Amino acid sequence: GVSKREGKGGVTMKQQLEPLFTPWKIGNCEIKNRIVLTSMGGTNLLGWMEVNHFDKDGAKFILEVAKNNCGLVLSGCQPVYNPMYGQWLYKKKKMYEDLAKWMPKFHKTGAKLFVQLTAGFGRSFTISEMMETLYTNKALRVLAKPFMDLDKITAAPSPSPNRWSDKVPSREMTVEEIQEFITAFGKTAKLLKDAGVDGVEIHAVHEGYLLDQFTLKYVNQRTDEYGGSFENRYRFAVEIVKEIKKVCGQDFPVSLRYSVESKTKGFREGALPGESFTEAGRDMAESEKAAKYLQDAGYDMLNCDNGTYDAWYWAHPPIYMPENCNLEDVAHIRKFVDIPVVCAGRMDPETAAAAIADGRIDGAGFARQFLADQE
């Protein structure tokens, strides 16, 4: 239970945290409290970077968190196109059968589950020395292609430098490839819905991942329908949610992982808290417009932070970043939408509870805290 020791202003800690334990809704999906386990490595239900399978270790961790009164679980990021062996997630049907058998056990906890689906990394894909060798040696690249097609995995909106390696540049994705991903999101979401999952989260117009790269002017230099204007840059993300709603129904909840501001000066150069700089990516003015635009396209929730892989420490804030480092920006964007907004990034429960009580955010995202203590 929550400690009864005195908190701020003479109220008990239990009273101070009460806003975290109030119900809310994402579309028609009611969540019992405002505590959200956000996605992180090791919480995948359908495997990761390996032959796809129902991941019993990930399921065990998620179930333990759910049993300890977490309201909404966002399971680990699942690529709709698995980088290893080039497998489309919707083609591996058995793991969805295993997931369906597990879901009643999860739902007994009273928690709700959204599975996070990603289009991938684009220029942010982490490149190891072995991958550099595979890519730069043409013979090895051909031999490795069936299980590690770096050319496809790292494809981006436009030719651009990889975040980590100068030896593996990104090529431009084709329109046909974009359409393949959109179709895959719909098919995968339908399989998850049929397995009993409560919703999905799209990864991501966030942190400079592939979908986000399409929205960012400093990465996206396309001249077709997926580049140039505001509407074109956000088209990929919009067409994904529309496809999911078409296949799964308008009432099936779809969240979006969303970075309010990029906090980025350019390729491989991020901004620090309080620094004066020229934003190369999404600034607040564009974000105000984008948040509503994405809501109107069909997204039912925004799961928010800041940053790109060029400014990674906003989305994965280490100890030297301020606590609640994304809260002010996320609370600001909340004014421009009618859908619920979750804030993540070194959140402390007391500050989160106060922000929820004041209507500044709707839910609080925690991840590493649950690794330390599932209770």
Report residues per predicted region:
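Flavin-dependent oxidoreductase catalytic cores
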Residues: 4-5, 9-375
